[in-house]
Regions:
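Signature aromatic-anchored transmembrane alpha helix within multi-pass, membrane-resident enzymes
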Residues: 205, 226-231, 381-437
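Periplasmic/ER-lumenal interhelical loops and adjacent helix-loop junctions
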Residues: 29-48, 235-312, 361-372
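Membrane-embedded helix bundles of polyisoprenyl
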Residues: 9, 98-117, 122-209, 225-237, ...
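Membrane-interface helix-loop-helix junctions at transmembrane boundaries of multi-pass membrane enzymes
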Residues: 211-226, 308-351, 412-415
């Protein structure tokens, strides 16, 4: 049952990186910025495990102080699972595979879970297609692989539904399963675990308001399962959490402003560059709504929102899940809008509930617009249930009574009933999904990672002592992480005093770039241009920086100079 949808989703995922498959070990989405960051950590996990290093801390970046890996979106679990591919074909290949798995796995996971509420496979398929290839996913696919891996979120929804609502399985089975999934999410993308806990709490609150009597009778089972899940999750996650909270190079304070990227009221209905059908007038409006293109994926479209509302209204009594999904969707959309309402790029000053949420433990650095992924999942649920309900209603309506036999009455179906019901339900999916058709894969910017041949040649072993410190010119930075990919291509033979990762600054708060230094300042000015003029004092300080970092080798693209 799942094979055909999974194959289709995988083909669509591969299409997102279509040009890369000509040379998947060299071609990728730039290999710089966030993409290069992710590639480095995929390679680090394989290298650390293979060489007996602590995978949760590294001084291969920002030497000698290093980086607490758990404070970064380092994908420990995916890195571990992809280690065989990384060892054989390198980080670029593993990254390309990871992106495809993220798209296909997210869609397939949603398909399987949605069949609980929408048993008709085409309805669940449409919901999976929406969740796995929404504008949110297309945007995050431009470089944020950790936010692209949503395949565990529907599984958590399924387990919470079992634990809080259905309760057909013993809590001592559901609780441990939820714990394992939560820890897997922690080791994939910690921000998603935090946001899932937030939305799970809101969803539970909606349940209590809508169905207080049912909740009351199910409360002991639910609390027992949640408590067991919490205990087991803490035990399983003890080592990584201890490293994050008490280990070296831990951070204090918030990592980023929650309001940095947030949904505009119009962003839900105005298409952006992430979708194919976006007229120039809409693009002009979208460009003024704030954020960058990767963090502008809240677009759902008017047709989908109208269908979602219609499903809630029409199936209000017959399918209670739509009531829950409708109110939870509204709450999620409000939270994704940040601390105050913004309309058309203009601040209204109207306060929103996120002002309270951002002060909750573990949620201080939550990026509000990323909650749009939960809005997509809820819309996928409503679309799937709506299609399933429409098909059932049409089949019932087209049924005609047959002559009674004995004491009973049977109903005979018209031969065309199933076909017409499926066609109309399919048309509903087309109306909802066509406006969300992703932009061409060409927009992904697939290109050669352009790794200088020197880093993959025997010259590295000949000129660079294993574990020594090396500086590339240009050095790695938040503006260009390409030198980190060069380091991974050289199999982490050397450490670097620069990089692009979250680590504590002088005040303990997070920063992504290197500590201030004369050498780093000069290199930054060289990158920006024009060439700086250096006096004797600057040269002396730069040499002192290199000596303090114990630098043995300086590499200018394809040339190595050892000193």
């Amino acid at each position: 049952v799942v094979l055909v949808p999974a194959v289709i989703y995988t083909a669509l995922g591969m299409l997102r990186l279509a040009p890369a498959w000509r040379a998947p070990t060299k071609l990728t989405q730039c290999g710089c910025g966030d993409g290069g960051f992710t590639m480095w950590y995929l390679g680090w996990m394989q290298y650390a495990l293979g060489h007996g290093h602590n995978p949760l801390f590294t001084d291969w970046l920002f030497y000698p102080t290093g980086v607490n890996v758990m404070w970064n979106v380092s994908l420990p679990l995916p890195g571990f699972l992809l280690s065989p591919l990384t060892a054989e074909w390198g980080v670029i290949f593993s990254y390309n595979v990871l992106v495809v798995v993220a798209f296909a796995g997210t869609a397939t996971s949603a398909y399987l879970v949605l069949r609980r509420w929408a048993p008709w496979p085409p309805a669940a398929f449409a919901g999976g297609l929406l969740y796995g290839f929404s504008p949110y996913m297309i945007g995050q696919g431009l470089g944020h692989a950790h936010m692209l891996l949503l395949l565990l979120i529907p599984v958590m929804l399924l387990l919470l539904d079992e634990l809080l609502v259905r309760q057909q399985i013993r809590f001592w089975i559901t609780g441990p399963l939820l714990a394992v999934v939560a820890v897997a999410q922690l080791l994939t993308a910690e921000e998603l675990l935090a946001s899932a806990a937030l939305i799970g709490g809101i969803g539970a609150g909606v349940l209590i308001v809508l169905f207080p009597g049912r909740v009351r009778t199910r409360l002991p089972h639910a609390l027992a399962g949640l408590a067991l899940a919490g205990v087991i999750a803490l035990a399983l996650a003890a080592v990584p959490l201890k490293n994050q909270l008490t280990g070296p190079q831990r951070l204090t304070g918030t990592v980023s402003s929650p309001d940095l990227y947030r949904a505009d009221l119009l962003s839900w209905v105005v298409p952006s560059r992430l979708v194919h059908f976006a007229p120039p007038a809409a693009l002009d409006i979208s460009s003024r709504l704030g954020g960058n293109v990767a963090e502008n994926g809240s677009y759902l479209g008017i047709p989908l929102l109208v269908i979602a509302v219609g499903v809630v209204v029409l199936l209000w009594r017959s399918r209670p899940v739509v009531r829950w999904a409708g109110f939870t969707l509204l709450a999620v959309m409000v939270l994704a809008s940040g601390r105050s309402l913004k309309v058309g790029g203009h601040e209204t000053g109207v306060p929103l509930p996120f002002r309270v949420v951002e002060h909750l433990p573990l949620l201080e650095s939550l990026v509000s617009i990323r909650l749009a992924s939960y809005a997509v999942l809820l819309c996928a649920l409503l679309l799937a249930v709506g299609m399933d309900g429409l098909r059932g209603w049409i089949r019932t309506w087209q049924a005609e009574p047959a002559p009674a036999e004995g004491t009973g009455t049977r109903r005979a179906w018209r031969p065309t009933a199933g076909v017409s019901a499926g066609a109309l339900a399919g048309a509903l999916a087309v109306v909802a999904l066509l406006p969300l058709l992703p932009t061409s894969y060409r927009y992904n910017g697939i290109r050669d990672a352009d790794i200088p041949p020197w880093f993959t040649s025997v010259a590295v072993q000949a000129r660079v002592p294993d574990g020594s410190v090396l500086v590339t010119l240009p050095p790695a930075s938040p503006q260009t992480s390409a030198p980190m990919v060069w380091q991974s291509a050289a199999h982490y033979r050397f450490k670097v005093p620069f990089g692009y990762s979250l680590h504590p600054g002088d005040d303990g708060r997070g920063q992504f770039g290197p500590y201030p230094s004369t050498f780093g300042g000069v290199m930054a000015r060289v990158r920006r241009g024009p060439q700086p003029r250096l006096n004797a004092e600057s040269i002396r300080e730069m040499r002192a920086n290199l000596a303090a970092w114990q630098v043995r080798t300086v590499v200018l693209r394809d040339q190595a100079h050892t000193h």
